[in-house]
């Protein structure tokens, strides 16, 4: 309606301004540009949010499908392991028995466990011998233990580990005189410790089974 009035006025050569009631509804160019800019911003924001929701929905769907497949695979593996755990042998007239299949992982674990136990015992015996040498021969300027006496001392300590820190019998105790020989030279701590360790390791290897002994030698 406004455009028609403007056209008629233009044709007649007269310029008639619309009333104030209509002038308030006409927007300026700045307002139009501002509105268009706001619309573009809002449109971009809505499209971005829609794309994010679309991607999130797609990822959630893919994750759900992946979890479903993973759970199915785990279930199938569990059922297969349960089915292959034993071999069922059905013989007419004989009670049904289940024979477990050999498990290499279990055998390797047991062998490793046995090896660790042997190493631990070996280390504990070596440490014990060093402690004995340091305790019993710390002040051995006058006496030195011969090989036979040292062997007896080691065996006695292993049989009675609670008496390791008991004082060594003196030379005047009769039966224990063979543990000592008199010398004017100072005892060689290194040689005493080394000999004690060699004795313990030799006894330890003799106590092991053939397989363990072969592994120790290698």
Swiss-Prot record:
Keywords in alphabetical order: Mitochondrion, Ribonucleoprotein, Ribosomal protein
Cellular localisation: Mitochondrion
Entry's Gene Ontology BP terms: mitochondrial translation
Record has Cytoplasm as a keyword: no
Principal location: mitochondrion
GO cellular component, one term: mitochondrial small ribosomal subunit
Functional note: Component of the mitochondrial ribosome (mitoribosome), a dedicated translation machinery responsible for the synthesis of mitochondrial genome-encoded proteins, including at least some of the essential transmembrane subunits of the mitochondrial respiratory chain. The mitoribosomes are attached to the mitochondrial inner membrane and translation products are cotranslationally integrated into the membrane.
Subunit structure: Component of the mitochondrial small ribosomal subunit (mt-SSU). Mature yeast 74S mitochondrial ribosomes consist of a small (37S) and a large (54S) subunit. The 37S small subunit contains a 15S ribosomal RNA (15S mt-rRNA) and at least 32 different proteins. The 54S large subunit contains a 21S rRNA (21S mt-rRNA) and at least 45 different proteins.
Family statement drawn from the similarity comment of this UniProt entry: Belongs to the mitochondrion-specific ribosomal protein mS26 family.
Name this protein carries in UniProt: Small ribosomal subunit protein mS26
Native species: Schizosaccharomyces pombe (strain 972 / ATCC 24843)
